[in-house]
Amino acid sequence: FPEADMPEGLIAFEAMGDGDRSFPSTPGDLFVMLKSSRIDLALEVGKYLILGFAPIADCVEDQRGFKYLDDRDLINFVDGTENPRGTERVAAVLVPSGTYAGGTHLLIQTYLDRQAEWNALTIEDQEGVIGRTKFDDIEIPDAEKKPFAHNVKSKVEIDGTEIKMFRQNRAIGTAKEHGTMFVGFAAEASTLTTSLRQMITADADGNYDHLLDFVTATTGAMYFVPPQAFLDAITG
């Protein structure tokens, strides 16, 4: 939409790094998510989308995500437990006012698991890295959490108030090579980038998100999902 104003706060995703940890930037112009219980139909629609856009755009990545067990990732922890619900989700995800009210910022990343290294940890150590119990998905009490736990370093707080995002992560890959596609929505892009910066950057005590010792980020891009009213207005 070259004649439309840029959504407030929309930024290109910039690569991040600290020590031997990195989040690469792999920009894209358009992200399409197809959701269906019929893999064959989703694939058919995807094929025609690629053909339809072929004169003006190249498909640079095509991932098939899937639900794994009881909404677990492929390191076998439940993913998305702390997602906001109901009206809290609406407040966390949707831009509240202005031209793009009802739209949302979207961050996409692909992570590949370093499974052998992860499997070498004891279950207790794995739970320390994640900040939740593995089998029954119970959050470890704050006083007992490791300062490098994933749910500590990825949490965004401003003046003591947690700023939520909504995740629709999906397991991806094969038995040989697999991981997670991070799909994060937020009312402000800064919520998403702040979370990543806290994860990857070691604090004054040297703590960063230790989950990054067991996964490798391979892609990263920021998008904006416009509200339906905006799409209706420009298409007439």
Model-predicted segments: where are they?
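Long, histidine/aromatic-enriched segments associated with O2/redox biology
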Residues: 1-236
